[in-house]
């Protein structure tokens, strides 16, 4: 069985379905620090304006006082990649695939199933805080490595931000898809192409119920197709021709 890892997103939209917010034990130490920060501290940590930091401060304090609602993560996050993932009108098989084989890597919650209930928050591995004297990446590394040991065949749709959260020896069987546009024999990639393609790729995997590495090679989605000559055992390259 394939396991997919996807990142979080800064952009969020409130879905209809809500739940009580139950915070994992490993996240409590982070919440304690974030909820105690001033708007000035948050502005520096996030590299945002103080006006925006006030909104984030309220979210953290609501969580600390257990007043936050929680929403299925894959529905709450609404960044470019998420908007290209099929999230509505799923078949029973697609819903099972999304909730049982897709996991979200978070610097606040750890690694969670795609439908895990989470609260509105802003947090990533660039957030400048220390947890028990450790960086966020060091703090989460044991948890992330344990997940990798339990799920050896991972299809990673993660950005470079996560490269050194996992130890290298945990990623021996990982495959990272790469998405490129071809025009007049020239190949190019950029974040917009990649984010849209990640969502479309995951949707195609769900719709085709891909369960083996070889099944990924036959996928055609949003104009992309597998390119064997550019691919390696650990990097599957998908090309889209541009006019």
From Swiss-Prot:
Disulfide bonds: none annotated. GO terms for cellular component: cytosol. It holds the Pfam family H2O2_YaaD. It comes from the Bacteria. It comes from Streptococcus pyogenes serotype M1. The lineage of its organism: Bacteria, Bacillati, Bacillota, Bacilli, Lactobacillales. NCBIfam families: PRK02101.1-4. One of its GO terms (biological process) is response to hydroperoxide. This is UPF0246 protein SPy_2104/M5005_Spy1788. Belongs to the UPF0246 family. Transmembrane segments: none annotated. InterPro entries: YaaA.
């Amino acid at each position: 069985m394939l396991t997919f890892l996807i990142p979080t997103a800064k952009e969020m939209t409130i879905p209809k379905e809500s739940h009580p917010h139950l915070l994992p034990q490993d996240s409590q130490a982070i919440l304690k620090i974030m909820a105690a920060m001033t708007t000035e501290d948050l502005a520096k940590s996030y590299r945002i304006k103080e006006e925006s930091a006030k909104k984030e401060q309220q979210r953290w304090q609501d969580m600390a006082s257990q007043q936050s609602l929680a929403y299925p993560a894959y529905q709450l996050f609404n960044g470019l990649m998420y908007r290209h993932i099929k999230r509505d009108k799923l078949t029973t098989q697609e819903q099972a695939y999304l909730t049982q084989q897709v996991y979200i890597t978070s610097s606040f919650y750890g690694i969670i199933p795609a439908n895990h209930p989470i609260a509105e928050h802003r947090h990533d591995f660039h957030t400048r805080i220390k947890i028990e004297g450790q960086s966020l990446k060091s703090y989460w590394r044991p948890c992330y490595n344990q997940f990798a040991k339990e799920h050896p065949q991972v299809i990673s749709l993660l950005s470079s931000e996560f490269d050194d959260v996992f130890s290298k020896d945990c990623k021996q069987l990982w495959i990272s898809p790469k998405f490129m546009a071809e025009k007049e024999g020239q190949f190019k990639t950029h974040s917009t192409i990649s984010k849209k393609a990640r969502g479309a790729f995951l949707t195609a995997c769900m719709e085709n119920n891909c369960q083996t590495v070889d099944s990924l090679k036959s996928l055609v989605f949003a104009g992309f197709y597998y390119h064997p000559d550019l691919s390696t055992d650990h990097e599957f390259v998908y090309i889209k021709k541009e006019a």
